[in-house]
Design a protein with these regions (language model features):
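Conserved ABC transporter NBD signature motif
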Residues: 76-86, 91
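Short, charged/small-residue-rich alpha-helical element at the C-terminal edge
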Residues: 238-311
C-alpha cells in the first residue's frame, strides 16, 4: 500500500468530547430468554481507535450490527455521529465499513467495485487514487474472482476508506495479509486518524489491539467484562516473576509459590520493586537465580482470564 495523500490533523487527544462519535447506553438485544447483548454502555471519542474484543459469541458482532444500523436493539439507545443509526441519510455517507467478508460481485473489476461502493456511499474521492493507496493499481482491471485473499482484503479496505469517512469500522482488517501489507494498512490507518477519522476495530490479533488501540472494550456474555486503556486493563492482573534456587537455599524475601526442583513463582502488582528486592537478596546471599524470567501482564493474559472469572 502507499501512504494516504491527505492532510494531517490532531487524532485523539485522550479526552472525550462533549458529543462522542458513538454513544451506547443500556443496550439490550434479546431472543426470548437469551441475551446476545445485555445492559451494554460505552462511548467512543472523536479521533479515537477503539477496539471491541471478546471471545466467540460474546456479542461483538450483534453490537456492531446495531451501531451500524443493520439490526434493531430490543432496548437501549445508540447515537452515531449525533444521530440514530436508523437515520441512514444522516449517517451512511459519513461512515465506512470493512466487513470480514465483503460479498463483492466476483464479476466486477477492482476499479468497478471501488467506483460502485464509493458511489453508493455518496462520498467524493478519486477511484484510481484510492486503488493506488492500497497498491492495487496493477490489478485495476482484474475481476474480484481473480484476486488473492490478501488482495481482496485490501479491496475491502479501499471501499471502507473511500472519501475519508469520519467513522470507520474495521472487522479483522489484517486477516490474510502478509507482514508488509499489514504494516502498510496500519500506516494508512494512522494517516486517517491524523486527519480526524474515528476507528472501531475488531480483531483476533491481540497484539495489534495492544499496540494500536487507545481504549479497549472486552466483551463476555453480552456485556463488558472490562474496559479501559491497555495499561488500565493489564493492571487488573499481577505480573509474574519466575526463578530457581539451589537446594538448601533460604526462602526468598517475597511471597512466592514453590514448585518442584526449587522453582518459584511470584505474582506481583509491583514488578520493578519486587524484582529489585529479589536481586538484591540473591546478591547478599551469594545465590544464583537460575531461569530468572519476569514480564508484565499482557492483553493476552487479560483475555485468557475472562474464561477463568465467574460469570
Amino acid at each position: 500500500m502507499r501512504p494516504l495523500l491527505r492532510g494531517v490533523g490532531s487524532g485523539w487527544d485522550g479526552v472525550m468530547s462533549t458529543t462522542p462519535v458513538i454513544d451506547v447506553h443500556q443496550l439490550n438485544l434479546a431472543y426470548g430468554d437469551f441475551h446476545a447483548v445485555k445492559d451494554l454502555s460505552f462511548r467512543v471519542g472523536q479521533g479515537e481507535l477503539y477496539a471491541l474484543l471478546g471471545t466467540n459469541g460474546a456479542g461483538k458482532t450483534s453490537t456492531l450490527e446495531i451501531i451500524e444500523g443493520h439490526r434493531k436493539a430490543t432496548s437501549g439507545t445508540v447515537s452515531v455521529l449525533g444521530h440514530s443509526p436508523s437515520d441512514r441519510g444522516a449517517v451512511r455517507s459519513r461512515m465506512g465499513i470493512m466487513l470480514q467478508e465483503s460479498g463483492f460481485s466476483p464479476d466486477l473489476t477492482v476499479r468497478e467495485t471501488v467506483g460502485l461502493i464509493g458511489g453508493l456511499s455518496r462520498r467524493v474521492d478519486d477511484v484510481d487514487r484510492v486503488i493506488d493507496v492500497v497498491d492495487l493499481k496493477r490489478k485495476a482491471t482484474t475481476r474480484v474472482s481473480q484476486l488473492s485473499g490478501g488482495e481482496k482484503r485490501r479491496l475491502d479496505f479501499a471501499t471502507a476508506v473511500y472519501g475519508g469517512p469520519e467513522l470507520i469500522f474495521l472487522d479483522e482488517p489484517t486477516t490474510g495479509l502478509d507482514i508488509s501489507s499489514r504494516d502498510d494498512l496500519w500506516r494508512a490507518v494512522d494517516r486517517l486518524r491524523e486527519d480526524g477519522s474515528t476507528i472501531v476495530l475488531t480483531t483476533h490479533y491481540l497484539e495489534e489491539a495492544q499496540q494500536r488501540a487507545d481504549r479497549i472494550g472486552l466483551m463476555h456474555r453480552g456485556t463488558f467484562h472490562r474496559e479501559g486503556t491497555v495499561a488500565e486493563l493489564t493492571q487488573t492482573l499481577p505480573a509474574v516473576i519466575g526463578f530457581r534456587l539451589p537446594a538448601g537455599s533460604p526462602p526468598p524475601p517475597i511471597p512466592a509459590a514453590a514448585a518442584s526442583a526449587g522453582a518459584f513463582t511470584v505474582e506481583t502488582f509491583q514488578l520493578q520493586f519486587d524484582l529489585r528486592v529479589l536481586l538484591d537478596w540473591a546478591h547478599q546471599q551469594g545465590l544464583e537465580l537460575a531461569d530468572l524470567h519476569a514480564g508484565p501482564t499482557s492483553l493476552d493474559d487479560v483475555f485468557r482470564a475472562i474464561g477463568a472469572d465467574p460469570a
